[in-house]
């Protein structure tokens, strides 16, 4: 998929293994993986951070192949899912950091332009999540209250 606000085509990506079966050398069962997700979710880790932890320390390449569900679905079933989707959360966090930078550097025109691009991405993503009913229909991004969302 191409980039939204950059000329890059975005061709490079990691390839998933062709086989969707669990590797024979993996000793963890689906219940063990779900238990690990529960422990890491209790600590406040995001689904992508949990996936990295499981991959690096437990050798679970794809949680979906082992458990049959994605990490976020498992977290939702356990009641540990974040209230804001992860990609939207990090875009808001980036916008808050850019606003803080612009308060200190008022003449930074390029950062002001990039902030407009980031905020347009936030609005676009919020519109998508409203149609998928992940966010409530009356949810609105406001720059004044954004720092409270990511704090």
Swiss-Prot record:
SUPFAM superfamilies reported in the protein's UniProt record: S15/NS1 RNA-binding domain (SSF47060)
Protein's GO biological process: translation
Organism encoding this protein: Spodoptera frugiperda (Fall armyworm)
PROSITE patterns listed in its UniProt record: RIBOSOMAL_S15
Gene, per the UniProt record: RpS13
Any single GO CC term annotated in Swiss-Prot or TrEMBL for this entry: cytosolic small ribosomal subunit
TM ranges: none
Name this protein carries in UniProt: Small ribosomal subunit protein uS15
UniProt GO MF annotations: small ribosomal subunit rRNA binding; structural constituent of ribosome
NCBIfam families: PRK08561.1
Membership in a protein family: Belongs to the universal ribosomal protein uS15 family.
InterPro entries: Ribosomal_uS15, Ribosomal_uS15_arc_euk, Ribosomal_uS15_N, uS15_NS1_RNA-bd_sf
Keywords per UniProt: Ribonucleoprotein, Ribosomal protein
Superkingdom per UniProt: Eukaryota
């Amino acid at each position: 998929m191409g980039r939204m606000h950059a000329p890059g085509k975005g061709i490079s990506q990691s390839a998933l293994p062709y086989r969707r079966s669990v590797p024979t050398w993996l000793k963890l069962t689906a219940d063990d993986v779900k238990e690990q997700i529960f422990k890491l979710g209790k600590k406040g880790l995001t689904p992508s951070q949990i996936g990295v932890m499981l991959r690096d320390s437990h050798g679970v390449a794809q949680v979906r192949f082992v458990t049959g569900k994605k990490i976020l679905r498992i977290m939702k079933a356990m009641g540990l899912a974040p209230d804001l989707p992860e990609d939207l959360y990090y875009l808001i966090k980036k916008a808050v950091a850019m606003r803080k930078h612009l308060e200190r550097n008022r003449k930074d025109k390029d950062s002001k332009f990039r902030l407009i691009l980031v905020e347009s991405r936030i609005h676009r993503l919020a519109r998508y999540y409203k149609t998928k009913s992940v966010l409530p229909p009356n949810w609105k991004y406001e720059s004044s209250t954004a720092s409270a969302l990511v704090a």
